[in-house]
Amino acid sequence: MSKLFIFFLLVALLAFVSSEAAECVAKGQNCIVGKSTCCIGQCIIKDHVLGSCE
């Protein structure tokens, strides 16, 4: 794979993660401030895999 392809893949992944995090916060599941046990990564995983971020 070319370095350019890998670069675009990383950019796309970053954009996806940030949009997911924004959606998570918008739903009232504030991953950064309100819930110390629910950082952004955990929030995305729990919300999509377990159906809850609590």
Curated annotation (Swiss-Prot):
Compartment list: Secreted
Recorded coiled-coil stretches: none
Signal sequence region: 1-21
Disulfide-bond pairs as recorded: C24-C39, C31-C43, C38-C53
Keywords (A to Z) from UniProt: Disulfide bond, Knottin, Secreted, Signal
Uses in industry and biotechnology: Potential candidate for insect pest control through ingestion. Feeding leaves coated with this peptide to neonate D.saccharalis result in increased mortality and significantly reduced feeding compared to caterpillars fed untreated leaves.
Tissue: Expressed by the venom duct.
One GO term describing the cellular component: extracellular region
Notes on the domains: The presence of a 'disulfide through disulfide knot' structurally defines this protein as a knottin.
Note: Highly abundant in venom.
Role noted for this protein: This endoparasitoid wasp peptide has a role in disruption of the cellular host immune response, since it reduces the capacity of D.saccharalis hemocytes to encapsulate foreign bodies. On the other hand, it shows no effect on the humoral immune response, since it has no effect on phenoloxidase activity.
Protein name: H-bracotoxin-Cf4
Organism: Cotesia flavipes (Parasitic wasp)
